[in-house]
């Protein structure tokens, strides 16, 4: 059985304090011990239920408490979701992520969610969902349907968390991660840089993630996307080097996890993204929208991968992230593609 290092905040801060190039060198060494440095795993994302969320997350345009101009939508029909999944698969995707703006799914919605998972699995794709908090029974129902991954972010450190969210406790988030893991579903959990947190808070977040009974298989690191109408719309810009440091420290602390560039890539130039890959990021969401925030369009992603000589991974459903298939690689290296996913606006 694999053993994991138990990290302290002091140890994490010591990594953040290293000279940047020294930190990048260490992170790249760790990365090469566990992954092929030329491979980037690619996921697609669809918002299956948008807006009208009762939570008060200060960064989120989907909260019903803020006037952001986002139009709410009911849970999509199963057939609509499967049609989007088919289009994503035709474009080369092998993992389909479905997100719903809920505090938690209602029991009346569970049969539809189960059908979505079963339908996407029947297409030969990996499945991922982010639906808010889950009960033990809900986690097991989704696991029985074939759900591969569940995303539930911790967002920030326990100490800073109450400044950003009051409608869901930190412990609730940890409890959901435990239920997901106990049900046999792989865990996807990360956080956001740019909420107004300190470097100690970033260190605290990564310590929480790394010290879980088993670190998450995927760790999304988001850069705050400031949305007009949310309480954080006037937050200071995130320094690119500070974001890159966070990626590098995450790679060192969770050497076997996929570190994903998620929201905020639209704000990054090619050089920043390239340094994130050098720092150990090896997963992205691909296409024009990430739920309700901008994401670089697919043509820009294709061009960047070709410039950097990166082969995005296409994963085989039965073997997880590490299995390679050729279709997406060929698309990314040799030509443009149609829109990769249709995340809701």
Swiss-Prot record:
Co-factor remark: Binds 1 [4Fe-4S] cluster. The cluster is coordinated with 3 cysteines and an exchangeable S-adenosyl-L-methionine.
Annotated catalysed reactions: (4R,5S)-dethiobiotin + (sulfur carrier)-SH + 2 reduced [2Fe-2S]-[ferredoxin] + 2 S-adenosyl-L-methionine = (sulfur carrier)-H + biotin + 2 5'-deoxyadenosine + 2 L-methionine + 2 oxidized [2Fe-2S]-[ferredoxin]
Cofactor requirement: [4Fe-4S] cluster; [2Fe-2S] cluster
Molecular-function GO terms, alphabetical: 2 iron, 2 sulfur cluster binding; 4 iron, 4 sulfur cluster binding; biotin synthase activity; iron ion binding
Listed pathway(s): Cofactor biosynthesis; biotin biosynthesis; biotin from 7,8-diaminononanoate: step 2/2
Top EC class of this enzyme: transferase
Binding sites annotated in the UniProt record for [2Fe-2S] cluster: 97, 128, 188, 260
Residues that bind [4Fe-4S] cluster: 53, 57, 60
Top-rank lineage group of the source organism: Bacteria
Keyword Transferase on entry: yes
Gene3D superfamilies linked to this entry: Aldolase class I
GO biological process, one term: biotin biosynthetic process
Swiss-Prot/TrEMBL keywords: 2Fe-2S, 4Fe-4S, Biotin biosynthesis, Iron, Iron-sulfur, Metal-binding, S-adenosyl-L-methionine, Transferase
Residue span(s) of domain Radical SAM core: 38-256
SUPFAM superfamilies referenced in this protein's UniProt entry, alphabetically: Radical SAM enzymes (SSF102114)
Keyword Transferase: yes
E.C. numbers: 2.8.1.6
NCBIfam families: bioB
Function statement: Catalyzes the conversion of dethiobiotin (DTB) to biotin by the insertion of a sulfur atom into dethiobiotin via a radical-based mechanism.
Protein family: Belongs to the radical SAM superfamily. Biotin synthase family.
Description of how the protein assembles with itself and partners: Homodimer.
Identification of the protein by name: Biotin synthase
